[in-house]
């Protein structure tokens, strides 16, 4: 990607692409398919696996909307905040337990507007609040402390690391640890390994290890792309286009 200013080249951005089947075979690529990269928010659907595998959806009576929000980098619109609130209520908790922090919701930037000085925002407006509400629910279900659920050594995060490693076909100790913008652990891995994780996720019920969970996650995101994203965003348009 090239960016110009006044007709003169100012910036060049390079990237890599890897297309992988669910066996891990690289079928097509551009750039370096093994480039070591942090997964950031692409990891969210996989970070939900411990909750899904433990029967958390059924335990708390979550719907597809709640599952979709666990995978979201949402815009902090009313529907996103309300869905996060519902998840917390089902887990018997309030937004004060969320460890994601807060920021001005994305929908203001997308609309080209600034919030009123009178408006205040809490953790439910954070784009990662659904993921964190899922974290909280998992801890409640298993009797784990909520005080430091974002710490890498917490049983929740150990379960996340274990399941992510299984999905991408790596040893958990080989996942490179970092901290995401919402304070949760995040992992770097070769691009081809991340692509494998998404190939398996897309296979849904056909996956022999996580099929039931992948089917629920895929269906939820497909049915409720507006909860995964937000009004006016390109990724929402892509998802709605099928």
Task: Identify what each model region corresponds to.
Residues 1-34:
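Beta-lactamase-like hydrolase cores
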Residues 9, 39, 124-132, 151-156, ...:
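Short, contiguous, pocket-lining structural segments
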Residues 30-38, 70-74, 118-126, 178-185:
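A short glycine/serine-rich beta->alpha loop
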Residues 39-57:
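Active-site SXXK
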Residues 61-71, 97-101, 176-181, 210-223:
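Beta-strand segments within the central parallel beta-sheet cores of soluble alpha/beta enzyme folds
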Residues 63-174:
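Active-site-adjacent helix/loop patches that line small-molecule binding or acyl-intermediate pockets
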Residues 185-204, 213, 217-222:
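Active-site-proximal alpha-helical segments within enzyme catalytic domains
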Residues 210-242:
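Conserved SxxK-family serine transpeptidase/carboxypeptidase catalytic domain
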């Amino acid at each position: 990607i090239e960016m110009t200013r006044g007709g003169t080249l100012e910036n060049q951005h390079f990237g890599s692409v890897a297309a992988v089947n669910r066996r891990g075979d690289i079928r097509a690529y551009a750039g370096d398919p093994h480039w070591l990269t942090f997964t950031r928010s692409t990891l969210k659907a996989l970070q939900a696996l411990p909750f899904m595998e433990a029967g958390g959806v059924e335990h708390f009576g979550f719907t597809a909307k709640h599952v979709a929000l666990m995978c979201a980098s949402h815009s902090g619109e009313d529907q996103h905040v309300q869905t996060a609130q519902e998840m917390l209520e089902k887990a018997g908790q309030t937004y004060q337990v969320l460890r994601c922090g807060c920021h001005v919701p994305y929908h203001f930037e997308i609309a080209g507007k600034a919030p009123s000085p009178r408006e205040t925002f809490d953790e439910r407006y954070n784009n990662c609040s659904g993921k964190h509400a899922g974290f909280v629910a998992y801890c409640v279900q298993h009797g784990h402390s909520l005080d430091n659920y974002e710490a890498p050594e917490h049983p929740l995060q150990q379960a996340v690391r274990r399941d992510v490693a299984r999905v991408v076909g790596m040893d958990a100790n080989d996942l490179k640890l970092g901290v995401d913008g919402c304070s949760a652990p995040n992992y770097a891995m070769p691009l081809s390994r991340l692509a494998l994780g998404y190939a398996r996720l897309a296979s849904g019920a056909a996956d022999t290890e996580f099929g039931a969970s992948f089917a629920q996650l895929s269906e939820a995101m497909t049915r409720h792309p507006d909860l995964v994203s937000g009004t006016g965003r390109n990724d929402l348009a892509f998802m709605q286009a099928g």
